[in-house]
Amino acid sequence: MLACVTMKMLRHAKCFQRLAIFGSVRALHKDNRTATPQNFSNYESMKQDFKLGIPEYFNFAKDVLDQWTDKEKAGKKPSNPAFWWINRNGEEVRWSFEELGSLSRKFANILSEACSLQRGDRVILILPRVPEWWLANVACLRTGTVLIPGTTQLTQKDILYRLQSSKANCIITNDVLAPAVDAVAPKCENLHSKLIVSENSREGWGNLKEMMKHASDSHTCVKTKHNEIMAIFFTSGTSGYPKMTAHTHSSFGLGLSVNGRFWLDLTPSDVMWNTSDTGWAKSAWSSVFSPWIQGACVFTHHLPRFEPTSILQTLSKYPITVFCSAPTVYRMLVQNDMASYKFKSLKHCVSAGEPITPDVTEKWRNKTGLDIYEGYGQTETVLICGNFKGMKIKPGSMGKPSPAFDVKIVDVNGNVLPPGQEGDIGIQVLPNRPFGLFTHYVDNPSKTASTLRGNFYITGDRGYMDEDGYFWFVARADDVILSSGYRIGPFEVENALNEHPSVAESAVVSSPDPIRGEVVKAFVVLNPDYKSHDQEQLIKEIQEHVKKTTAPYKYPRKVEFIQELPKTISGKTKRNELRKKEWKTI
């Protein structure tokens, strides 16, 4: 029976079990690879019965994490750690929920006392996958300070922009980026506190490791209203500077229960590994809120760079039951010989970030016996659509709407389109705004207003819904190619390209043409075995393959072989960069 979370249940800690445990605890059966959901019976009942009351006050640290500590002490949860960290040097950290609570309260006292931060002050966090990153997340929750994550790939210019535009009061980083911060700090009038995660001291910085040794673990969590701003995520658009996307204590702290309970299908017995970079909102999705609201263990491997063999070895060595990664990672993994790896505990694999092509899911299934359950969402949302356990997977589809949202395909006037017709993917926000949606773009009311059309929030993505209610991604609205009157989405062309044995990966954009206005151009990364082939002949073979695989008018009239595709830190292909280069605008 699907649990219903009511306002009364959320107001009282003693009722927390019904919020977080959502179904029975399951034991780990190493040979059990069933796709039967643990937390719901089927998609239809999940969608129909789901309710989530939003209390006036909510704080994830107090109302979720501390409640798991109480259950842990009472012996009412499995012995999995709350947090499990490893690195390539063989070092390992395991924290129970009680230890996570104690350490995060110490960190909270450092923020409040040593850094003199007040509720609502903003904290930029730029760290790789180190344990302190998770402590900082929880410490900000406890103090009511607003967390602003950033990737360690940020340049000095990027850091300056983020510090100035966010008006951040504190920054937390490491030895690598501290010099860049020091170089721009005089230009950031709101910045008054700097914490460094390092074995060494640095002038003008508080050394977190040393301060943690002396900090008290006695701290009272602030009482935050559900609609207070909890975090701000910088998200890049197709033009201009990155936007600041604001989320509240309820939009992510409660909203991501949808991800954890339904899409990830987590229980307290699970060990969840998400490979996302710490600077991406996907880490909040699958490395913090979704697993911990379900009482699951957050597992992470501090890999400085992507290494397919390290990922395969880790999945084989450790009792990871749920694995989440970007399509690019899965594509690179299946190119390896996986016969020697046995994933004895792995039961559930999910992917997000951009569409995953059917050829990758088929290869993964053939090599592991497991399906990949694709999910679709944005920095601005929790899970919008997904493939859920217990429902048929249509290869290439992003599944059906999550319980959080009423999703439709709409036209330019905000009218709902029938099945089969392409339009803009929208989420209904009137008359009642759903709980798992961002509040606004900070200091950018015009951009916030531009996302609304009629009764809908417009995602900026194009797609269609089929007769069975499955949603299909076509392209970002700005990625659609208009050629000789045809509208061509890059994903379908890329899907066809990637099925050719010579293609490791591809990206499709528009290219100027004097007759057709624009045509399809494919940037192709070749598999190693094909790099010595005659390129002109190979281009013809690839073009003919696409003509036979999809509608002939979609084939790439131009093909360019490149060494690698430009990617964002989350693994998404930067089609916009390729398109601008093609049109000579950069």
Swiss-Prot record:
Keywords recorded for this protein, A-Z: Acetylation, ATP-binding, Fatty acid metabolism, Ligase, Lipid metabolism, Magnesium, Metal-binding, Mitochondrion, Nucleotide-binding, Transit peptide
Cofactor(s) this protein cannot do without: Mg(2+); Mn(2+)
SUPFAM superfamilies documented for this protein: Acetyl-CoA synthetase-like
Enzyme class: ligase
GO cellular component entries: mitochondrial matrix; mitochondrion
Subcellular locations according to the entry: Mitochondrion; Mitochondrion matrix
Catalyzed reactions: a medium-chain fatty acid + ATP + CoA = a medium-chain fatty acyl-CoA + AMP + diphosphate; propanoate + ATP + CoA = propanoyl-CoA + AMP + diphosphate; butanoate + ATP + CoA = butanoyl-CoA + AMP + diphosphate; 2-methylpropanoate + ATP + CoA = 2-methylpropanoyl-CoA + AMP + diphosphate
UniProt-annotated binding residues for ATP: 235-243, 374-379, 461, 476, 572
Signal sequence region: none
Keyword Mitochondrion: yes
Disulphide-bonded residues: none
Transmembrane intervals: none
One of the protein's GO biological processes: acyl-CoA metabolic process
Span of chain positions assigned to the transit peptide in the UniProt entry: 1-27
Domain of life the protein comes from: Eukaryota
EC number: 6.2.1.2, 6.2.1.17
UniProt GO molecular function: 2-methylbutanoate-CoA ligase activity; ATP binding; fatty-acyl-CoA synthase activity; medium-chain fatty acid-CoA ligase activity; metal ion binding; propionate-CoA ligase activity
Modified residues (N6-acetyllysine): K157
Sequence positions bearing N6-succinyllysine: K73, K106
Functional description taken from the UniProt entry: Catalyzes the activation of fatty acids by CoA to produce an acyl-CoA, the first step in fatty acid metabolism. Capable of activating medium-chain fatty acids with a preference for isobutyrate among fatty acids with 2-6 carbon atoms.
Family listed: Belongs to the ATP-dependent AMP-binding enzyme family.
The protein's name: Acyl-coenzyme A synthetase ACSM3, mitochondrial
Organism: Pongo abelii
Gene: ACSM3
